[in-house]
Design a protein with these regions (language model features):
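Compact alpha/beta protein-protein interaction domains typified by the UBC
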Residues: 2-163
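Domain-scale recognition of soluble eukaryotic interaction modules
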Residues: 2-4, 10, 136-228
Length: 228
């Protein structure tokens, strides 16, 4: 069975709207009812179970905010990553800088839930943060100080295939298992920090050294503006 509702934007034909019922291309029945009545009937068909508790899946421990769109099955996860040291490959798979100082990061992951227990990463945005205080809507956001990230914070992944995970909990370590496993190039390395170093010299300088917070450049956005 197929149900189709027809109405006109002509105010004089407002009450001439109708609901048709078709079966295999053959019209079986037709009802005339106003658009207001149709909306009321449609709204009443969505019953809310007040006794049902809706639970989120288990979430990453570094998650500070998330949104979920049930129509598109899209998840946006915002993870707060404390400053750490990481090996970084630059320009090719053979050139590796050891234990490079990475500042505190704010990473926004966007996942599409393709089916139960399957989440495809579609985009990620990376920003830097200062200090160790808790994040609030007024927290100032800074640019990711390395390369491969454009002016709005979106990471360019190039030919790297975006990962699929089986549980949102796995996003907790995606910065280690995916982001810093990619090869960094000079792409978008322009006004990313206030040092005068080229990317290779910067990575060399930061080996086994914490990233200097005073080198960060403001993104001209607050956390509250990012999550709007």
């Amino acid at each position: 069975m197929e149900f189709s509702f027809h109405f006109s934007d002509d105010i004089e034909k407002y009450n001439e709207s109708r609901l048709e019922i078709n079966d295999s291309g053959i019209k079986r029945d037709e009802f005339y009812l106003s658009l207001t009545e149709f909306i009321r009937l449609l709204g009443n068909s969505f019953a809310i179970d007040l006794n049902k508790t809706y639970k989120s899946p288990i979430l990453p421990k570094n998650l500070i905010h998330y949104t979920y769109n049930p129509l598109t099955k899209t998840w946006e996860l915002f993870c707060d990553i404390q400053a750490f040291l990481s090996d970084i490959k630059a320009f090719n798979d053979e050139t590796v800088f050891i234990k490079v100082g990475i500042p505190r990061l704010l990473i926004k992951y966007i996942f599409n839930e393709t089916r139960e227990h399957s989440y495809q990463l579609t985009e990620l945005f990376i920003y830097a943060l200062k200090d160790t205080e808790s994040i609030n809507e007024d927290t100032q956001i800074y640019k990711f100080p390395f390369s491969n990230v454009n002016n709005v914070g979106r990471m360019c992944t190039g030919s790297n295939k975006l990962p699929k995970i089986n549980a949102l909990l796995e996003a907790e370590n995606l910065h280690k298992n995916y982001l810093f496993q990619t090869v960094f190039t000079n792409h978008f390395y322009n006004e990313r920090n206030v040092s005068s170093y080229s990317l290779d010299k910067l990575l060399s300088k930061l080996q086994e050294q914490a990233f200097p917070q005073e080198w960060l450049i403001e993104q001209n956005m607050t956390f509250g503006e990012i999550i709007k």
